[in-house]
């Protein structure tokens, strides 16, 4: 069986991570949560009260990012600290575009991601996987959905975690995040020329997973 690389890109809350995790489990692939890596960098920036990219990188080099399978799914570690939940707070979410747009941060993270992906048998999701991180990926998907639907998804997700959230404010924040991600100077959110455009509006997770898995199995 061929060890393929699958890249899933798309805007915030389009379902990338959920879909990628399920496909990884179903097809026996490694799931590399690139978004979580940038959220870690943002968390470090907030906790250390710095926007100095070199200091953020140095902290992460001293406390490496790793992923582990926990009882409730994949866990994100920074050194020995479990940051799975804290990197998903609104404070981190609203600051991640700014930190992830820093050239030095992106170059550091991309190098780390490419190193891990070299062996193949991997699925990654993010904003620039198909265009920058894994331009040679065997299968590229660009997953989109309406702002309203994405806000509803994030709203329900936050409620299930006990995080109080205002739906209308979420819609504004997601639309603004789209604008920032699409217009930033470094690696903007962009569909790769050879990526398959998949609109998930009105579709179930099961339908999206099935579509991508059918494409992937033909390449394995």
UniProtKB/Swiss-Prot annotation:
From the UniProt record, list the reaction(s) this protein catalyses: CMP + ATP = CDP + ADP; dCMP + ATP = dCDP + ADP
Q: What class of enzyme is it?
A: transferase
Tell me the Gene Ontology biological-process terms attached to this UniProt entry. Answer: nucleobase-containing small molecule interconversion; pyrimidine nucleotide metabolic process
Q: What is this protein called?
A: Cytidylate kinase
Does Cytoplasm appear among the keywords? yes
Q: Which GO terms describe its cellular component?
A: cytosol
Keyword annotations: ATP-binding, Cytoplasm, Kinase, Nucleotide-binding, Transferase
Question: Which PANTHER family does the UniProt entry name for this protein?
Answer: CYTIDYLATE KINASE, CYTIDYLATE KINASE/PANTOATE-BETA-ALANINE LIGASE
Signal sequence, renumbered to the chain: none
Q: Which Pfam families match?
A: Cytidylate_kin
Which family does the entry's similarity section mention?
Belongs to the cytidylate kinase family. Type 1 subfamily.
Q: Binding of ATP: at which residues?
A: 10-18
**Gene3D superfamilies annotated for this entry?**
P-loop containing nucleotide triphosphate hydrolases
Locations listed in the record:
Cytoplasm
What is this enzyme's EC?
2.7.4.25
